[in-house]
Amino acid sequence: MPLVDPVTMSTPSTPAKAMGKSLPNTVKDPSPPPKAGSHTRSPVESPSNSYYIAASIPALQLQIFVLLWKRLVDDPVATMSRLILPVMALIQVFYAVVLLPVAGSGKQWRKPRPGEKKKAQGGEPNIALATLLSLLLTLIATPPIHALMVLFGAPFLTHAPHTFLCALNLSLLTLFPLFYTRGAEASAWRALAGFTAPIDESVGGLVGACFGAWLGAVPIPLDWDRDWQRWPVTVLTGIYVGYAIGSYGGRTLLRIRGYSAKRS
């Protein structure tokens, strides 16, 4: 029997080991894995895209109103109830849900003190519920706005549907975004009523629409005998024009304040 040197004898190598030595090391991805429940940001949610989309909303609403202005002069009630209000409601809901922060989304939760039991913290606000609640509050706020218009000289008995629909337009444009972003927080509404709230597009739109409604009532008593002088064509026109101007003015002030904060 031949002798075999144990030193020179080669051990059989498996194919897996041979392939493992020949293959280069795999480079691992340094980026952390996505968290559970996270989603890819859509193009609309991009900060640059969302700014331009939000900036185009008042201009779009004003263009739609201009296209429907002739019909508004001919039949104010039918045009407001069947065309203007449904279209504006859809635009406002899209604007709020996609581009505005819902009330409570940026709330900072307080850490429990030593010995204090940790309270159950709710998750993110329910956007669908917040939208429905904001629409309901918008509808509830319409009768008080109607009453204010009557106090400022709107017809009391003869044009009640006209006044109510005009008040609903004003409430939908100005109060719905505020209800959606501020919710029922008393401090936020006190700051808004006391003119101490920071100026943004929603506050600017509110101020501009109210001033536009007041300015739009000026041509009504003039003796020009024009169809567009009928209630509430000029007032509603002033609301939409003032809302667009105020919204862009508030947006500009907000950007200037943010730019100044970055520089400081």
Curated annotation (Swiss-Prot):
UniProt entry tagged with the keyword Transmembrane helix: yes
Membrane topology: Multi-pass membrane protein
Any one Gene Ontology BP term: GPI anchor biosynthetic process
Keyword Transmembrane carried by entry: yes
InterPro entries to which the protein is assigned, alphabetical: GPI_biosynthesis_protein_Pig-F
Subcellular localization(s) per the UniProt record: Endoplasmic reticulum membrane
Protein keywords: Endoplasmic reticulum, GPI-anchor biosynthesis, Membrane, Transmembrane, Transmembrane helix
A Pfam family reported for this protein in Swiss-Prot or TrEMBL: PIG-F
Transmembrane residue ranges: 49-69, 83-103, 132-152, 160-180, 202-222, 233-253
Highest taxon in the source lineage: Eukaryota
Main location: endoplasmic reticulum
GO cellular component terms listed in the entry, alphabetical order: endoplasmic reticulum membrane
Region of interest (Disordered), ranges: 1-45
Pathway membership: Glycolipid biosynthesis; glycosylphosphatidylinositol-anchor biosynthesis
Protein family: Belongs to the PIGF family.
Function: Acts in the GPI biosynthetic pathway between GlcNAc-PI synthesis and GPI transfer to protein.
Name of the featured protein: Glycosylphosphatidylinositol anchor biosynthesis protein 11
Lineage: Eukaryota, Fungi, Dikarya, Ascomycota, Pezizomycotina
Chain's gene name: GPI11
